[in-house]
Structures are given as structure tokens and as C-alpha cells.
């Protein structure tokens, strides 16, 4: 339960102070190689790879490859990740008949931008996500050397 509480704690105050000079890094689009951040700094990938719809596009089937690649890159550059979690997945939103919304991040983002319909499914996703990158030695990403300690929900 502590892990869930940590996730739900939001670092909204960082939004206004994050810039390239800040130790908290900057909001970056991870597809742009030069915007992945400098060595030895904080990075805040935005929207980043921590999108529920991308990781669990089908209920119960988790795709970690893109997130793992980002974490490995950050480890190689001694970066501290402040991960932004996006709590939307199409299959969950369809279950409660949410209306579609236009995403500011294009097609790689979900079609729906409402709160999760099933909090149990969302809790399961959050638990698996944090457990994979928490560095406690149980269910961790293979090769994890620098755990993610700071999480932001939707920024």
C-alpha cells in the first residue's frame, strides 16, 4: 500500500520550476534523442513511456520493452527519472462508455482521457509498474541498477 501512496503523491510544484538548470530536469519528449536530458541530472519524460494504454493495451498483457529501454538509457547516463504516469487505457475507458477526447500527444496516446473506470484494474497496473522499477529485488526489470523513486500522476 505504501507503493500506491507514493505513486499518488504528485510533484505538481515541480511543473513551474523545472527547466534545464533545475536539478529536477525538464519536461522532455523522449522520441527526440537530444532532449533525453544530460548526464547526471533528473529527467521528466513527457508524456514518456509510462502510459497505461501503451504498457497494458490488452487487459492482463504487459508490454515493458519501451519503458525498459528508457530506464536503461537513463541508467547509462546516471539520470534520475521522475516518471509521469498516464492513467488511461482504451479497454478500461470503453468499459464505462467514456467519450473520446483529442489527445495533445497524438495517436500514440489513448483515445480517452478520463479517470480510470476500474480502480481495481488501475491499482493492479500501478502495483506492477512500481514493482518493476522499485529496485527491491522482487519482480524488478532485469538489469535494474537505478530504481525509480519518484512518480507523478498526470503532472
Residue map of PLM features:
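N-terminal substrate-binding region of glycoside hydrolase catalytic domains
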Residues: 21-155
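Sec-dependent N-terminal signal peptides
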Residues: 4-14
